[in-house]
């Protein structure tokens, strides 16, 4: 069963995404910001199959989190989420470490498909 770490500062979004991907049998952990997510990644020694993170968050944003996660855990697959076009553009320079950017709002089916695609893809 794939382990997925979800980072989003919006409680409702974290819960929605966690429930949606749990429907496919994935084991999820959640974090309210990038710093908390990085702490979980470190504590769990990177033992996640996917990091699914919002870009715009307090304390540490999703791009800083993605860069730190890719540096410390190069085999970790990363999927970003954003509701802002300018944030999506910021993420475009991260193609080497990020599988995709999912645009909010999305449906349950959209996020389940994006997660399945990311998990099925080869890293690098």
Predicted regions and their residues:
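Charged docking surfaces used in two-component/phosphorelay signaling
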Residues: 15-23
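Acidic, metal-coordinating helix/loop segments flanking the phosphotransfer/catalytic sites
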Residues: 30-50, 89
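Acidic catalytic/metal-coordinating carboxylates
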Residues: 33-36, 61-65
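Active-site T/S-Asp motif of two-component receiver
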Residues: 53-54
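Receiver (REC) domain active-site loop signature in two-component systems and cognate sites
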Residues: 57
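As written
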Residues: 62, 93-102
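C-terminal output helix
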Residues: 106-119, 123
């Amino acid at each position: 069963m794939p382990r997925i770490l979800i980072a989003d500062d919006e409680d409702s979004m974290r819960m929605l995404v966690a429930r949606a991907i749990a429907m496919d049998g994935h084991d999820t952990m959640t974090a309210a910001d990038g710093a908390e997510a990085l702490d979980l990644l470190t504590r769990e020694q990177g033992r996640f199959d996917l990091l699914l993170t919002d870009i715009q968050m307090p304390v540490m944003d999703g791009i800083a989190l993605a860069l730190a996660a890719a540096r410390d855990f190069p085999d970790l697959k990363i999927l970003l989420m954003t509701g802002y076009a300018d944030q999506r553009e910021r993420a475009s320079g991260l193609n080497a470490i990020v599988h995709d950017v999912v645009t909010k709002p999305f449906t349950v089916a959209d996020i389940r498909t994006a997660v399945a695609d990311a998990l099925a893809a080869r890293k690098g």
